Amino acid sequence: MKAVDEKLANYQFEYTGTSDDDLLIGLESGKYDIGTKGAWYTDERAKKFVIPSEPVGASIIGFTVRKEDEQKYKTIDDFAKNKGKLVPISPQNAQWNVITSYNEKHQDAPIELTAAESFKVADAYAWVLEGRYDAFFDIKLSFEKAVTAEDGPYHQYADKLSWFPYKGIPTYPLIHRDEKGEKFAKEYEKAIKELKEDGTLAKLSQQYFKEDVFSYVDKD
């Protein structure tokens, strides 16, 4: 967003660090004008906030599996065809929609979706390790911070768990829904398109994530 800020001479950004809950409440109330939290597009969010047409980033989503199964499950198609059991997902979670979309396109070999309320990530990893489920639908950055990193809270599982990618999910800034927000969204879209076309977004992605996260996003 700082690169967007530099493009928009008519706007002066003031940055505030906060929790996800406060960000969402603040955006609805008008306390904040714009917020970024790696938010995916959902119809529910689009009713509450202005969501620009152009993403600011992407989350790489994939599957955490047991290391012993990393040759068996190399792609989402492998997982589906081998009838792998997926850790339950809340229907309110945007990840539910990703699997639902996959199943609609692969009705001959869908992934079984089980609805569940929220649970601790530690439980999901433990369930996979003990064989209760075969995979946890997990964001790459979350897996790296939680398991791969030496100071990660679940690093003790690093030699027992593996992760493979499925696709990139575009992430968007959320903007307070009012006339001012609608106007800003149009200015943002113009700026972000320029940053995309001149290669700035890809360079920033390489700088912070060591890869171009946009390359994982479907082009259709």
Regions found by a protein language model. Give the residues of each.
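Short helix-initiation/N-cap motifs at beta->coil->alpha
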Residues: F13-I25, I111-A126, E130
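Ligand-binding cleft/hinge of the Venus flytrap
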Residues: M1-Y11, Q92-S118, Y125, V147-Y154
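Extracytoplasmic small-molecule ligand-binding "clamshell" domains
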Residues: M1-A39, D198
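Hydrophobic residues within well-ordered alpha-helices
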Residues: V4, L27-E28, F63, F79, ...
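A ligand-binding cleft/hinge motif common to bilobed small-molecule-binding domains
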Residues: D22, E28, T36-K47, N97-S101, ...
